[in-house]
Structures are given as C-alpha cells and as structure tokens.
C-alpha cells in the first residue's frame, strides 16, 4: 500500500523510511555466499577443462569474462558485514567470501574494504573519495579512463589515498597485500606462459580481468554516481533506468539501478535493494534523491 507522503514532515519521512528498511535487513544472504564461492570454483575449473581440451579456449574466455564481472559483489557484501557481523558464529564465512571472491581479479579484500568505507564516507568528494577517479561525462569516457588505468605509469588512486594514512597498521597491511596480490598474479602468468600456456593465461585470466574490471567500474561506480557533482546523503547517488527497461537490463547492471538504497541503508543485501526501493520510492523522492526514470 503506497503512502501519501505529500503532507509528511521530514521527521515522519525519516521514520517511515527506517521502518521500511528494517524489514529488509537481517539473515544470512546465502545467495551471495554461493555466488562468491561458486564463481571462484567455476573459474578454477576452467583451467583443467581448457588445458585438457574438454572445453574450447574461446568458450573458456567467455566464461572467464563472466567470472571476473561477478567477482566483486559478494566481497562487497562481506565488506559491509552483511553475511555475518563481528561476533556472529558465521563471521568466518563473511571473511572467507570477502577474501576468496575477488581472487580472480587480484584485488585483496583488505584494500577493497578500506577504500569502500572511505567511498561511503566521502562519496563524490574529489579529494577523499577513492572512486571519484571514475568520474566522466559519458559511459564510453568512463570505460576509456579504465583502459588508461591499465597503462604503465598510472597512479592508482586507492594506493594514493592509503599512502596518506601512512603509519596506520591496517592501511599499511592492505598496501602490502595489494603488492603481493599483483606480484603473485604476474608470477603466475609468467609461469603459465613459460610452461606453454601463454594463450590460456592471457584469455582465462589477464584479458578477462581487464574486461571485468572495466565493466564493474562502469556499472558499480560510474552509472550510480554520474555526474559526481553532489555530496549530500540523498544527492550523491541516483536511481536510474538502464536503456529505459527493467528485467534483463537490471540483471545486466547487477541491480545497480537501485544503488541509492545501498548508500542509504548498506545493511540491506544486494538482492533486496530492488524491493526496498519500490516500497520506499515515494519517500525517497520526497526527500530529494536524483531519479532518472526509475
């Protein structure tokens, strides 16, 4: 039943929004657990299947691209402790999903968690938001920015922001882990190439990881925050409709059309953001969110 919000005060709107949000918070989001661990297992399975000729390399490449594109969001849930909070008996599972799901893209959970919390705290701040570097007027310029980030000499904004926290043991450890992850990936690729699997290394790991990261930055970072102009809690993220449609289009953007709900209520798991949005939509619009057709 839709609420008439036209005569509600700001305090009443805030109370109604919180009451709706509470209905979608809680429980273990098992879908994200299966997604994160299952996606990693599928990617690992590609290697023996392709190397033994059971699966053609071109098919392995397509699956690997999908694996890389799916690698981040389960870790994202873990970053917010949505699988299990501190002190919960399943906290180990939260951390396992956080670490394992992003192994294919060679990004450590520690650095992703720190920078993502900074993103939430300073969304769209040019100096403090680690994701502000994804700012671009158009989607293809955003993709091009990502391509440029793959070039030699590129300065990673995540590293820059963490280096400013020099002396912080958590930040120092995250930077060390990031170096070890990248070094490990390079050594693994060199070893595979030296062993006669250069094409497999390129098409099952290196190239899919670049494609997946570009897709993730476009859908998870650029699209929900463009034009990156405002910093208010209800103005720094938008609700939007991809190509004017829902259904398959929402799947292709991995639910990011409802990313405004995540920024307002990060304890709501990804797959509940849509239902939560539609229930609180009128309230959010009354509170001034940018709504591009959703």
Q: Across the structure, where does each feature detected by a protein language model lie?
A:
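Long helical/loop segments within the catalytic core of UDP-sugar-dependent glycosyltransferases
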Residues: 66, 245-256
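Juxtamembrane helix-capping/reentrant segments at transmembrane boundaries
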Residues: 81-107, 127-141, 231-246
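Transmembrane alpha-helical segments that form the membrane-embedded catalytic/substrate-channel core
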Residues: 66-78, 108, 206-232
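A short, ordered amphipathic alpha-helix with a cationic face
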Residues: 89, 177-178, 249-251
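Membrane-helix boundary/juxtamembrane motif in polytopic membrane proteins
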Residues: 167-173, 206, 229-243
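Histidine-centered catalytic micro-motifs
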Residues: 72-81, 112-124, 220-227, 252-268
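Non-catalytic, topology-defining segments of multipass membrane proteins
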Residues: 1-65, 74, 99-207, 269-294
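Juxtamembrane/interfacial segments around transmembrane helices
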Residues: 87-95, 114-118, 144-155, 228-238, ...
